[in-house]
Regions:
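Membrane-interface soluble catalytic domains
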Residues: 2-22, 30-34, 55-62, 73, ...
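Transmembrane and membrane-interface helices of multi-pass
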Residues: 2-129
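Metal-dependent active-site segment of extracytoplasmic phospho-/sulfohydrolases and closely related
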Residues: 161-162, 337-376, 418-419
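Histidine-centered active-site microenvironments of extracellular/periplasmic hydrolases
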Residues: 177-181, 354-355, 361-397
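Short beta-strand segments
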Residues: 239-241, 299-306, 332, 357-362, ...
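A solvent-exposed, charged loop/short amphipathic helix patch at secondary-structure junctions
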Residues: 315-332
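Polyampholytic, low-complexity intrinsically disordered segments
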Residues: 333-336, 453
Length: 467
């Protein structure tokens, strides 16, 4: 994040937020709706609570505000007539029948119901805060000009494809040493397979932020990413995504996608929206691109949902081999689904008639929870090596053999790989070693959830059980 963005964010924080005023008004109305007398202290205290929760636990704040707004909206007419809830009002509510209830509802003035609707409407507005703020954040991230200085452009292939997987552990894939034959395509296709590639961090936003962007003082410069580098080099760029485009965990990465010449998302909201969208729906988009002959070098990016928890949502509950729990079994089957997508994409590229090279890697791995139990599942973590052990493979139109590369590689060096792979040289990228080789690259550090650099070798182990 560069100084311009930091300054703008600080300016926003210094400014008086209209949301603080809305929270104050809603807190006041909730207090009055429940029949309590006006209290500046209680109103201010609840406003501060909402602001604190928004900063540290936004989903909890939304739940609290939603429940309080709904209860206040419903109780407002009663509160004005009978006062604050107490034992007698609760007893009366419990003992009343339908006829008595309908009679009570008719005695309240119409404006009491109108006020209740107003309270409910304010609650809805408050619950929509994230989307509006994320749209503003997206505009900020997407609007900053890149600072790449391209010094040479010598692409070896006409089409370059980057497939970004999601939550795939390397040891869950047969092609990378996993115990299950669940990746028939990757296990046999010619290409370069990296058996010791380490992700930058343990969650999508943190990991891809450090992988896809130039990093200065441990801070991703979102304007200087691999897409803007390709744009500067004269490539035509495409981004097709099955991830979210607006949301707490999506906006920063989606802002990279927005830098492409063409960007299309299967989901309208965050990553949890439209859960039934499938990764293979992206193939119709790549087919359209490949159907037209183009003179410019092409960069096509596919961002998958892959193996994101819950895995059974990805597979519609389907799995091939039962391992410990249904969720674990579904997780293994997501690897087969991704493998088949890569097979279909590879076939499309072959049929295009153009030279091509495809790289696939996952953003991060997962760790086991409730290990050994019938409810065992996998989730995000940052304490184990397996959280960072992910697949990385390069398949090219001129690959002659299925080659295994054992040298350790770090996602922190992805831009160096991208530069060497595409033939795009830039003053800001220093190539310390040849990425596709057995050349040693030095120690690898990951970034944990506290944004601390940790030596990968010092992490614990979370092996995949065979049961």
């Amino acid at each position: 994040m560069n100084s311009t963005l930091i300054d703008s964010l600080l300016a926003r924080r210094r400014a008086v937020s209209p949301w603080a005023g809305l929270y104050f008004l809603q807190s006041l109305l909730i207090n009055l709706a429940l029949g309590y007398p006006f209290s500046l202290l209680y109103t201010a205290a609840f406003t501060c609570l909402l602001l604190l929760l928004w900063r540290y636990l936004p989903r909890g704040q939304k739940a609290l505000l939603g429940i309080c707004s709904l209860v206040a909206a419903c109780y407002f007419p009663f509160g004005q007539a009978y006062g604050a809830p107490n034992f007698n009002t609760l007893l009366a509510l419990h003992s009343t029948n339908m006829e008595e209830s309908s009679e009570i509802l008719t005695i309240f003035p119409w404006y009491s119901y109108l006020t209740g609707l107003f309270i409910f409407a304010l609650g809805i507005i408050a619950l929509r805060r994230r989307k509006e703020e994320e749209q503003h954040r997206m505009a900020q991230l997407s609007g900053i000009k890149d600072s790449w200085t391209v010094t040479a452009v010598k692409p070896r292939y006409h089409i370059y494809v980057v497939v970004i997987g999601e939550s795939a552990r390397r040891d869950a894939m047969g092609a990378f040493g996993g115990h299950w034959d669940n990746t028939p395509f990757a296990s046999h296709v010619n290409g370069d397979f990296f058996m010791d590639y380490i992700a930058a961090s343990g969650s999508t936003q943190k990991s891809l932020g450090l992988t896809l962007n130039r990093v200065v003082d441990n801070k991703p410069q979102y304007q200087d990413n691999f897409v803007t580098l390709a744009n500067r080099a004269g490539f035509q760029t495409w981004w097709f995504s099955n991830q979210g485009q607006i949301g707490e965990y999506d906006t920063a990465i989606a802002s990279i996608a927005k830098r492409a010449d063409e960007a299309h998302f299967l989901k309208n909201g965050d990553f949890e929206a439209d859960k039934n969208t499938r990764d293979d729906a992206l193939l119709s988009m790549t087919a359209q691109v490949l159907a037209t002959e183009r003179t410019q070098p092409q960069l096509i990016v596919l961002h998958l949902m892959g193996s994101h928890p819950q895995a059974c949502d990805r597979t519609q509950g389907k799995y091939a081999t039962f391992v410990q729990s249904k969720e674990t079994s579904c997780y293994l089957y997501t690897m087969t689904q991704t493998d088949d997508l890569l097979r279909q994409l590879y076939t499309q590229l072959r049929h295009s008639g153009d030279s091509f090279s495809l790289v696939y890697f996952s953003d991060h791995g997962l760790a086991f929870k409730e290990r050994g139990k019938a409810v065992q599942y996998l989730a995000h973590d940052d304490k184990f090596q397996q959280n960072f052990q992910v697949p990385f493979m390069v398949l090219s139109s001129d690959s002659k053999a299925h080659r295994i590369i054992k040298a350790r590689r770090s996602a922190n060096d992805f831009l160096s790989f991208f530069s060497q792979w595409t033939g795009i040289s830039a003053k800001e990228i220093k190539n310390r070693y040849r990425f596709i080789s057995e050349q040693k690259a030095g120690p690898v550090y990951i970034t944990n959830f506290k944004l601390q650099k940790v030596d990968y070798n010092h992490l614990g182990s979370d092996i995949f059980s065979l049961k």
